[in-house]
C-alpha cells in the first residue's frame, strides 16, 4: 500500500471512529434522558401494580372455668371461599354449579339463607319461614326489602326478581332456585374484589381434598383455614355463655328515627361476614374475645398477573375470659336440680300438673361471685343450630334462662326482708310479739289466715321466721307499709338488677303506684305475694346480703381476663359493694336465728339433720292457675346460706309447680355436699362426689333418704293431686297459705 492509500484508509478510519463516537454520545444522552429525566415515569409504568387487602380473622379467645378448664374454645375448620380477584372472566354460574355438585357429592351444605323452597311439580315456590319464628319472619321481611319488593310479595314474586336480576332464565327451575339463593347470599356478604364470599363453612377434610383436586378448573375457589367456635363442655352454663353468629343486616346497617344510617360495626373494624358474639357472655365480652384481625396483601400488575402475596399484619388471638364458676360444681348443681324435680314428681306430684322446670343459683357470699347458675330444662350448645326448631317448640322452654330472667312470686322467702325492715326501723325489737290465732282481723270483711303450724299465741320475730307465721308478718307489714319494707328489700337485692354482665330481668316490688293497689296489698306483699316478682339470681343475692349482715356485693360471672398466649392476668374483677344496710342492734343476728331454725321444721328431709348449720327460708307462693275452684297450684321457693355462723355460700331456688318450698330441702343439702367436696378435692369432673366421706355421709341412712313426707307447715299430700287442707281452703287467692 502506497502512501496515498494509507492516508485514505486513515481518514476513513477517523470518520468511522467519529461516527461511532457520535452514536455512542447520542445513545448516552438518550440513556441519561430515560434514566434521570423520565426514570420515575418509566419505572411506574414498568411496575404498575395494585394491592388488594384481605382480612385474616383472628382466633376468638377461650372461655374457661375458675380452674382454667376450657368451656368455649376455637377449633380449626375449613371454609370454601370464592375470591373474585382470582376468578378472572370465568363463567360464574357454571363454576357455582360445579362447586354445588362437588359439595353435594360429599354430603356438604352451602350458605343459603333464602327462605324459599325448591319448586314443586307445578313450578311454584313457597316460603319456608316458620310462622311462629320471630327470627324467620324478620329475615323474610328483610329479604323482601333487600330485593326492593313489597311485603305482600309471594315466593314466586321473589324468585322472579332473582331470576331477572341474576340472568338465570336459561337454567332449569331447580337450578334457578339454587343459584338464586347463592347470588342472594353473595349480595348479603357484599361479594367483590376486596370482599370474599364464604360459600361453605366447616367442610370435611374429604371435601377439602376434592376441591383441591379440581383447583385448576376452579380458579378463585380457595380452601381457607378458619377458627370455629366449639363448646368443649357444651351443657355447662349455655344460657349464660350465649352464642356467636353472623352479623345480621339489622346490626350492620342501623337507621335511626331521623332516617340517618350508620354502620357501627364497620367503624369498629368488622367485615359484614364476620362472626360476632350475639348473646350472653360471648356478646358482653366481645371486645376481649374478638382479638385483632390480620391482613393479607395480594399484589396484581397491570396485566392482571398476581405478582406477590404476603401476610402484612399477623392476627392476634382474643383474650381468655375466666369465669368464677368451677365446671365440676356447675354440673353437680345441674344434676341435683334435675334429681330434685324428679323426686318431687315421683313422690308428690301425682296429679295432672308436674314439676317440669326450675332454677338454682349459688353465690360466694364473700364477693358476689356466681358459683353455679342452673336451669332445668336446659340445652346443648353444640346442638343449638341443628335442633333449634325442637328446642324452641318445647313447651318446657329449655332455651329460657329462668335463673336470670324468670320472674316468680317469692312467697315467704320475702319474710326475712320484712323482718329486717321492722327491726332496723325500730318498729319492733326481739321482745315484740304479735298474737296469732290463725286469723288476721284488722280489716273489716277481709280476714287472711295463717296455718298456725307449730305455733300460736304471742309470736316474736325469731319464732315468726321459724314457723313462717303469716299473722305476724301481716301485722308488721301493715304497720310498716310497703314503701318502707320495699326500700329494705331493694337494698337487700330484690326487685333490681344484681349487676351480672349479661341480660337479666329487673323484677318488681309491690308499690302504691301499682294500678291495682289497695291497702290490703301491703299485708299480702309482706308475705311475698301481691304484685312482687323476683328472679332466682336475685333470691341468691338477697340471701348473700342477709349472710353479710346487710352488705350487698355486685353479682358477677367473670373472675379475670387473661392473655391467651401467656396466661398472664390482664384484669381481675374486684369485689364491689353495691349497697349497705348498717343494721341497728342485733337486726341481722335475730333474722339469722330465725332462719337457722327453719331446717328443724322440715321433717324427714336431709336438711333437718344436716351436721352443718344452714340458715334458710322456704316459700310456697300460689300461681294464678287453679286445679279446682279456689285452689291454686304452688311453686317451691328457697333462700339459704351456710354455714349459718360463718357463711360461705348463698342459694336461691325456684321449682315451678313444686308444691311446697320445703321440698327443696334435699336440693340445698346436695348443693352443700357438692360445694364441700369441691373444697376438699373429692368432686369429680362429671359433678359426682368421690369416695371420700362428705358431711352428708356422716348422717344416718334415714336422714339421707329422699323425703317422703312433709310436716310442720307443709302437708304430705300435694293439693294439686286433689287433697285439700283446711287452711288452703280458707286462704284467699294471692296468699302464701301453706308455707315454711
Residue ranges and their predicted role:
Residues 87, 91, 325, 583, ...:
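Short alpha-helix boundary/capping segments
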Residues 681-740:
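Intrinsically disordered, low-complexity repeat and linker tracts
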Residues 93-101, 209, 213, 238-242, ...:
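Solvent-exposed, polar/charged alpha-helical surfaces in well-ordered, non-transmembrane soluble domains
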Residues 1-314, 350-359, 710, 714:
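Membrane-proximal periplasmic segments of bacterial cell-envelope enzymes
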Residues 286, 290-293, 301-304, 334-342, ...:
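Amphipathic, well-packed alpha-helical segments that form the structural scaffold of globular domains
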Residues 72-73, 78, 299-316, 325, ...:
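Beta-lactam-recognizing serine transpeptidase/beta-lactamase-like catalytic domain environment
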Residues 336-348, 426, 599:
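Structural motif corresponding to the C-terminal cap of alpha-helices
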Amino acid at each position: 500500500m502506497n502512501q496515498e492509500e494509507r492516508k485514505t484508509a486513515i481518514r476513513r478510519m477517523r470518520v468511522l471512529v467519529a461516527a461511532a463516537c457520535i452514536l455512542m454520545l447520542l445513545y448516552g444522552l438518550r440513556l441519561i434522558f430515560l434514566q434521570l429525566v423520565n426514570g420515575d415515569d418509566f419505572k411506574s409504568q414498568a411496575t404498575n401494580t395494585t394491592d388488594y387487602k384481605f382480612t385474616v380473622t383472628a382466633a376468638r379467645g377461650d372461655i374457661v372455668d375458675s380452674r382454667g378448664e376450657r368451656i368455649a374454645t376455637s377449633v380449626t375448620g375449613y371454609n370454601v371461599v370464592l375470591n373474585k380477584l382470582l376468578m378472572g372472566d370465568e363463567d360464574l354460574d357454571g363454576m357455582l354449579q360445579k362447586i354445588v355438585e362437588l359439595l353435594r357429592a360429599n354430603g356438604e351444605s352451602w350458605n343459603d339463607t333464602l327462605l324459599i323452597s325448591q319448586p314443586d311439580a307445578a313450578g311454584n315456590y313457597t316460603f319456608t319461614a316458620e310462622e311462629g319464628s320471630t327470627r324467620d319472619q324478620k329475615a323474610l321481611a328483610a329479604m323482601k326489602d333487600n330485593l326492593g319488593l313489597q311485603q305482600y310479595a309471594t315466593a314466586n314474586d321473589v324468585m322472579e326478581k332473582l331470576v331477572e336480576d341474576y340472568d338465570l332464565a336459561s337454567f332449569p327451575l331447580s337450578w334457578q332456585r339454587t343459584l338464586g339463593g347463592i347470588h342472594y347470599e353473595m349480595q348479603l356478604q357484599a361479594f367483590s374484589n376486596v370482599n370474599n364470599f364464604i360459600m361453605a363453612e366447616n367442610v370435611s377434610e374429604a371435601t377439602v381434598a376434592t376441591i383441591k383436586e379440581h383447583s385448576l378448573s376452579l380458579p378463585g375457589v380457595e380452601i381457607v383455614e378458619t377458627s370455629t367456635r366449639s363448646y368443649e363442655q357444651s351443657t355447662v352454663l349455655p344460657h349464660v355463655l350465649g352464642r356467636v353468629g353472623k352479623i345480621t343486616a339489622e346490626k350492620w346497617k342501623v337507621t335511626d328515627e331521623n332516617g340517618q344510617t350508620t354502620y357501627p360495626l364497620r367503624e369498629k373494624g368488622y367485615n359484614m361476614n364476620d362472626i360476632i358474639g350475639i348473646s350472653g357472655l360471648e356478646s358482653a365480652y366481645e371486645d376481649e374475645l374478638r382479638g385483632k384481625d390480620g391482613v393479607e396483601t395480594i399484589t396484581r400488575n397491570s396485566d392482571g398477573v398476581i405478582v406477590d402475596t404476603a401476610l402484612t399484619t399477623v392476627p392476634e388471638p382474643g383474650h381468655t375470659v375466666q369465669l368464677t364458676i368451677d365446671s365440676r360444681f356447675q354440673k353437680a348443681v345441674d344434676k341435683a336440680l334435675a334429681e330434685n324435680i324428679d323426686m318431687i314428681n315421683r313422690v308428690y306430684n301425682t296429679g295432672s300438673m308436674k314439676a317440669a322446670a326450675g332454677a338454682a343459683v349459688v353465690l360466694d357470699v364473700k364477693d358476689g361471685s356466681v358459683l353455679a347458675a342452673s336451669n332445668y330444662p336446659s340445652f346443648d350448645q353444640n346442638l343449638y343450630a341443628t335442633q333449634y326448631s325442637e328446642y324452641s317448640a318445647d313447651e318446657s322452654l329449655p332455651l329460657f334462662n329462668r335463673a336470670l330472667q324468670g320472674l316468680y312470686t317469692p312467697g315467704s322467702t320475702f319474710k326475712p326482708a320484712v323482718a329486717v325492715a321492722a327491726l332496723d326501723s325500730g318498729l319492733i325489737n326481739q321482745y315484740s310479739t304479735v298474737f296469732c290465732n290463725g286469723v288476721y282481723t284488722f280489716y273489716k270483711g277481709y280476714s287472711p289466715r295463717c296455718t298456725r303450724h307449730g305455733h300460736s299465741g304471742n309470736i316474736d320475730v325469731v319464732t315468726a321466721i321459724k314457723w313462717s307465721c303469716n299473722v305476724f308478718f301481716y301485722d308488721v307489714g301493715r304497720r310498716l307499709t310497703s314503701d318502707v319494707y320495699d326500700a329494705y328489700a331493694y337494698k337487700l337485692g330484690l326487685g333490681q338488677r344484681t349487676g351480672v354482665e349479661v341480660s337479666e330481668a329487673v323484677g318488681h316490688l309491690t308499690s302504691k303506684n301499682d294500678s291495682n293497689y289497695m291497702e290490703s296489698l301491703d299485708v299480702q306483699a309482706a308475705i311475698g305475694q301481691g304484685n312482687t316478682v323476683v328472679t332466682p339470681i336475685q333470691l341468691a343475692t338477697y340471701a348473700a346480703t342477709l349472710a353479710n349482715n346487710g352488705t350487698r356485693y355486685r353479682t358477677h360471672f367473670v373472675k379475670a381476663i387473661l392473655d391467651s398466649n401467656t396466661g398472664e392476668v390482664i384484669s381481675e374483677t374486684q369485689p364491689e359493694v353495691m349497697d349497705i344496710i348498717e343494721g341497728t342492734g342485733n337486726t341481722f343476728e335475730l333474722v339469722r336465728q330465725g332462719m337457722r331454725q327453719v331446717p328443724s321444721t322440715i321433717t324427714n328431709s336431709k336438711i333437718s339433720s344436716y351436721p352443718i348449720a344452714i340458715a334458710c327460708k322456704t316459700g310456697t307462693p300460689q300461681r294464678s292457675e287453679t286445679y279446682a275452684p279456689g285452689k291454686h297450684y304452688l311453686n317451691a321457693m328457697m333462700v339459704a346460706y351456710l354455714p349459718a355462723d360463718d357463711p360461705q355460700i348463698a342459694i336461691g331456688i325456684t321449682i315451678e309447680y313444686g308444691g311446697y318450698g320445703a321440698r327443696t330441702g334435699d336440693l340445698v343439702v346436695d348443693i352443700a355436699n357438692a360445694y364441700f367436696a369441691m373444697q376438699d378435692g373429692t368432686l369429680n369432673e362429671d359433678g359426682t362426689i368421690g369416695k371420700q366421706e362428705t358431711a352428708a355421709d356422716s348422717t344416718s341412712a334415714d336422714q339421707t333418704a329422699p323425703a317422703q313426707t312433709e310436716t310442720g307447715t307443709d302437708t304430705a299430700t300435694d293439693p294439686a293431686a286433689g287433697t285439700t287442707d283446711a287452711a288452703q281452703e280458707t286462704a284467699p287467692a294471692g296468699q302464701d297459705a301453706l308455707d315454711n
